[in-house]
Amino acid sequence: LRALGYQVTYVRNITDIDDKIIRRAHENHETIGALTARFIQAMNEDADRLGVLRPDHEPRATEHIGEIVAMIGSLMAKDYAYQAGNGDVYYSVSRFKGYGKLSGKHLDELRVGARVEMDESKREPLDFVLWKAAKPDEPSWDSPWGKGRPGWHIECSAMSTHCLGEHFDIHGGGMDLQFPHHENEIAQSEAATGQTFVNIWMHNGFVRVADEKMSKSLGNFFTVREVLARYRPEEIRYFILASHYRSPLSYSEENLQLARSELTRFYTALRGLPSMGEEKGVKGEGLGVRSNTSPLTPYASRFFSAMDDDFNTREAIAVLFDMVREINSHKSHEDIAKAAPLAAQLRKLAGIIGLLQGDPEAYLQGTADRFTAVVHVATGALVGGGANLKGTAEKVINVEEMIAQRNAAREAKNWAESDRIRDLLKANRIILEDGAHGTTWRRE
């Protein structure tokens, strides 16, 4: 959106008080504030590593009790809410005529299923809690209905309205939040303000493992941090963007390896070409970002068309691959004058979705310093001096030194030794590429 010139205010609210948080804090013998602060910090650290932009505002529910109480008060005054005999305050779902318009569900059908778990304190089985009466050993705040704490749904409405106003453009969240959470947000927000709550809802699909939804209860749950221990942040980001955000995301080692392989193709195409602005004629203007002064290039037009189609990053990446094919064609004919501007445009477009901003050499070699890069070799023979690596002991070799020794063997026309070094490195997932300007290497 920012690449299109829109001014974006990004809000990510945080529920820092609910039943699970209270229970976990008790189990850990720590304060709720300490528990939530620790998890919020970990979340932001992981998001930063994945290149997720920080929000402009990150409100926490406990910091907006005043706004929450005020919104509940408005609903009470308009007869959309009531206080039950147990002290809880509930939203009266039947009072809101548009209930179900987001999810397509109908009240009569919902009532049939809801009666099984009917709470005696409610007037109707679908009514949901806005304010929970205080319980012993739980945090609580003052309100016109007595001490208590907010329900989950009202927190989100109050915080988003506080930060963005009574009406805003885009609301996101997981597919599982569409009903009842987002349906309830619409009901309480529109009843309180009289305004349409949101223009566009964007619901992302679940992460699935072996065709099952990832969840703690199924035992197939893992954290971003655990995956980051095995894959680079850009590889994980690419893996996510290679699927449409509304589609299920199928997690597997095979799919992450595919993401690594495809990023390798991109960075191999960019390798040896100047970064944007490093060469005369390769500047920032006209590279494909929409503006009022320069027309879109054909590739940029296709890229933006894909992104305009419900944020179709999968199709946008397909456009970037078409650019790679043309870049490689120009490189094969040593036509750098054509390859370099196209590579600059590729970086510019990919940068819109947070990809291909790294150094190609660093990515392909898996290290920021190609001259000190090493590889662990378990079997085979080291070049030079007859050093033997046979056995189980793991040794470390310098890739650049081995390339130098291979070059010496080639100059001496010792092709057997040259091939042996190449094969040894290949066995350890190091691929050598001989070109007009010497030998380069990358990790397989």
Place the predicted regions along the sequence by residue.
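Alpha-helical recognition segments enriched in aromatics with Gly/Pro capping
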Residues: 1-4, 9, 45, 66-275
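Short, glycine/charge-rich beta-strand/loop segments that flank catalytic centers
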Residues: 11-19, 40-43, 53-68, 86-95
